[in-house]
Every structure is written in structure tokens, then in C-alpha cells.
Amino acid sequence: MKDKILWLSLNKFEVHKMDRTIQMKYRPDKEEITLTIYIKLLDDEKTLEFSYENAEGLEIENVRLLDDSLWITDSEDGYIIVPVREGLLIPSNSGRTFIHTFETFSYEGCHMEMLGVVKNRSAILITWHDPYVIAEVKSTLNSSAVQAKQILSLSLDLRKTAKAFKITFLGNGDYITIARAYREEAKKKGWFKSWRQKIREVPDAAKLIGASNFKLWSCLDRRLDYRMNEKSVTVNWTFEEVTKIAEHLKKDLGIEKALFVIGGWIHRGYDNQHPDILPAAPECGWNERLAEASKRIKNLGYLFCLHNNYQDIYRDSPSWSEDLIMKSQDGQLVKGGFWAGGQAWLICSKMGLELAKRPQNLPKVKELFNPNAYFTDTTFAAGLYECYDPKHPLTKWDDMKYKQELCNYTISLFGVFGSECGREWAIPCSHFFEGLVGVSGRYFHTLDPESMGARVIPLFEMVYRDCIAIYGKYGYDYSRAAEYIIYHIVIGRPLHYHTWSRGLYWEKAPKDEPQGWPYDSSCFIRADNGWAEGLCMIDRFIKNTHEVLSPLHEITAETIVTKHEYLTPDFRVEHVVFGEDVNVVVNKASGEFGRIFGYKDYVYNSKIAGEVILPPYGFVIESPTFIAFHALSWNGVKYEKPVLFTIRSLDGKPVSESRITKNKSFSWIWRVKNKN
């Protein structure tokens, strides 16, 4: 059988029934070896487990047990859900043809070990527990095999250690039903770890609840070309300026909760000479100034977080050694990306853990600066790797193990820990993900939902919301970010503020900055007649959005999304319920020429405030202790222009009977009606 590829057909199997199991055995002609497939009905009476085993001598490269199966036609009101970033719903009536693969735990692949299928309001959950599973979603138009305009189908490839998957029939249901079922499965796998457990172990983790993510990416920005020649060295912020920015956020803008992250603090700057990080960048103030920054920023009540990397190494790093680097099957060094420090090479995760533990690395960072949070770049973002160096071989399972050990070691030193993007295998050993929500102000990085006619849904919030803080990553244009803000309101997550001007930005802001327009994507930089009037654009945007998203996260962090629905046929208006009593309605319509939805107000009948008129990018949040809206009318009051307004209980009692704080971000006229 060596070097022989077999395509197995089900009609050549010997089929046997054994109690609750169907056994299908394949024997190639004139061969003694066998492949056996099992289909077992589990004790819950609604789950089928598919598995296989191969006889000794038969090497399996790939088994596709589902091949264009579980298909749905355009007339069957169906869809497939994929857990990529927040979640993707791919309908069976999009009119598009495509084939898209989602590899388990890869970049924009399946970030959870599951898929869901709904057909005529009947739901099934597909689960597995192995990183060597690859899902394929296929859409075919006008197939001759079935009388349908479109067929949406699913395939699963099992490779190497992947031997099984399960299909659970959930009966009448939708993607919320599927998410609830998978949440219980995640607990059985050991991926689930709640906020309560994490805060009990690391009390500072509570500071993430309601915290926005403020990140100064490159304090020192050193650029090399492909020949490792230095092109430029730029100081964007000294450590003293870093401190003043944090103090400005707290004292001038009133930002109470923040995850304050700095990158480019290491010896040669951002993405340079890893893993040789010390002393801190001399151009920015050396160790002494960074230690002072850490102390002062922590004294603000913030999480002070340092950005680091134990996957990339550069040829000019003092620790450079080919012995550290992953090897491909043909023995070649494995390349990473081309970053500020030039061509990066990928450190084997076993060796990366050893480097992190060196006295001059994380232990010394703890001793010198004592941050109360830490971030390791790329640890969760990159897919799980294999290494073929005989000195430190890795399977994907091994790579996961060593990365989890790096997380837990970092937690043991600093407390709060996070990394890039996020995968469910990292939930038990981290406190925040940076990048799972979105990338550069968009829902995805390279994946294009429109190519599949797909919609983003808050799937992650239905499964793991009460386990971890999650953010987007990279900079974006604050003056055109309204849709991104509305998306964050739907998922109830604080924003990431990663776009900054050099130095003390508010002192250097130009006089002619855009002021925003009420009905387009610049609406959240407005401040006319509001609290933020007179501030620079960055500060207006921060204040307007933080005052909505921070308290929304605070009151919902330990709940899950229990309801999500579209209130209009074009999907522009969404209704979300967190837990039992936090209701959110958003209008994603745009007032801008050429946008997908076009200008349209939406009238929402609120139980609290009666008729609420939501303009393009309007929203209303209603709960017993927090109310916020961007609306043209609320509680019987009509406004000439959309108003952004928040009302919050200060004592935990319902707003109608408590001491409250009011924040008017922009308006022409405003009132608050209160029983008291």
C-alpha cells in the first residue's frame, strides 16, 4: 500500500450493525488491511458520532467523511454558521458561487471547533476536538443534480490525529439554539472558564470589565530594509509622553477604565531584535523612565500593559540561532512576515517558552517595570504550527501546549494576560483577545463576507461572552467609523483606540479638523452643544464612544447574548438582548451616497421611552441601570438633529429611583424625564 492513494467509495463497504453502532469496513482488493468507519448513536439519543480507525500498514493522509453533505437549497430558508472572529452566517439563497475552506484555529478559519446548519428551521450542531480538521463550505448555482437555483453544502476533512466528529440534531431552532448547545459542549472540552473563576485567581482581571483598549503601537519605530540596512529611526512617544497621554485620558476626559498598552518600548523598537528586549529603548527614556511610567499609569487605576513577541526572531538579534527556528518538512527555516525589523523567522514555540523564561526576559521585565498586564504578539493569531526539527519537533497539539504554557507562565508573573486575535483553546489561559472583534475598522482582515453573501452575527457572544474581554486591532479612521461603532454596540464590547498622532496629540491638533455630520459615518466625532465641544477630534471620538460602550460592557460582561434578530428584511436594523433585561436596537442604514443600505430612519417602539426614531447609525440601549441613545426622538422629546445621550445609575438601583449621572455628548436641546 506504500505510495498508493486510495479513493474510497461507500458502496464498497461491508456494513454491520452492533448495538447502537453502524460499522462500515473497507477492504481494498487483494489487501489484508482495512479502514473501518463507525457511526454511533450516543446516550443523549440525538447525537451521532462519526469516527474511523485504520489497520496497521494503512497510512491515512486525509479522510473526508462528509463530502458536500448536509446541503441546503435556496428555497429551504437555510444557512451555515462558521465561528470565524465574532461569527459568520452564510445563507443558502445568496445567489453566489464559491468554495471557502475554514481550517481549525487558523487565521480567519474556525476559531471554535464547531459549525452549525439550519434548514427549514431545523438546527444541527457539528463539533470536533482536534486542530487537524478542515471545513469546506461550497455554493453551487443551477445544479443539474437537484432542482434548485442554489445548493449550499459542507465537507469535513480529517487529517493526522483527527479521527472523529459529532452531529447533534437540535430540532426546531436557529443559530442561537446552536450556540447554546455548543456552549455546553465547550464546558465539557475544558475550554470554558468564566470571569468569576478568572477574577478569583487574578483580581486585577476585573479591571478589564468596561475597559477600553488604548494602544500606542510604536514608541520607537525603527525600520530596516530587506538587506537589514537601517532606513529610519523615529521616536513617536517618549515614556514621559506615554505617561502624560494616560493622565490626560483620566484627568481631562474622565476615562475611568482602561487597558493601556504600549509597543515599541523594547531596546531597538517595535518588531525589532526579538527576543532581546532589554534595556528599554534609550531613545524613549531607558529603564528608569519606563519604570516611572508603569508606576504612574497603574496609580490611575489603569491596567498598564507591555507588548512583546516570542514567535519572531531577526538575524540581527543578539540571540539569533538557527537552532531556535522551526523547520519545514524539507529542513528549511520557516519564515515569518516582513516587519519593521526586516525579515522575521518563526521560533519554535517550545524554544520560545524557554526564551521567555530566561532571566533577562520576562523575569527581568517583572523586576524592572512590574506591569500589571502583558501582551504577547501573534501567539493566538497565527495558526497552530508543526516543526520538523529533530531537536524540537512539534505537532499542532504540541504547539498549542507550549503556547498555553507561555500564557500561564506570563500570568504567573504579571497577572492579566492577552494576545492577538484569539482562539477558544486560549480562553482558559488568557484574559483578553486583541483582534477577534475586527481589523482596521472592518469586520475581517482578508476574508470577504460579501463574496459569500454572508452576514456577521454575535456568535462568540452567545458562547464565551462571560469568559473574556475582546477587542479589535490596528488603527482606523475615527472620522468614518460609525458602522464600526454600531457593530460594537451590537456585540456590547468596548472599542480599541489604536490611531494616534505623534507626541501629545491634543496639543498639536490642527484647527481645521473635521467636526462630523449628523447623518453619515462621521457622526460620532460630533460635539455640538455637548460635553466634548472644543476638544480635538480624537478626544471627541474617545469620549463619545467610551461613554456608551464602557458601561454597556460593565452591565453585560457576565451575561451572554440571549436573543439576536433582524427587524427589517434588508438586515439593516438589529435587536439584541443581553441576559434578561438589556435591550439594544441599532439602525445600520447610511445617509451617504452609494452605501449599501441608504438613508432611512427606523421607528422603534420602546417599553421605556415610547416611540424612538433612530436615524442612520442610530441606536438605543435600555436597561434598568443604564440608558443610551443616538436618536431623533426619545421619551416624547423630538430633536432637530440626532442626539447622543447617556443616563446611568450611580448606586445600582433602577434609573427611575436612583442617583444618576447624565452625559450629553452632542445635541441641540435635551431633557430627562424622571419619576423623582
Across the structure, where does each feature detected by a protein language model lie?
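Carbohydrate-recognition beta-sandwich/jelly-roll modules
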Residues: M1-L259, G264, P282-C284, L300-L303, ...
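Short C-terminal domain-edge/linker segments immediately following a structured domain
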Residues: I80-R85, S94-R96, L290-A293, G336-F338, ...
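Short acidic, gly/pro-rich beta-turn/loop elements at beta-sheet edges
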Residues: I60-N62, T73-S75, Y270, Y314-D316, ...
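Glycine-centered flexibility motif
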Residues: P83, G269-Y270, G285, D466, ...
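Aromatic-lined carbohydrate-binding/catalytic grooves of carbohydrate-active enzymes
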Residues: K207-R358, E367-T376, F380-K391
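Residue-level recognition of well-ordered secondary-structure positions
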Residues: S51-E53, K250, K298, C305, ...
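Active-site-proximal substrate-binding groove within the catalytic cores of carbohydrate-active enzymes
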Residues: H129-I134, S139, S153-F169, G173-I178, ...
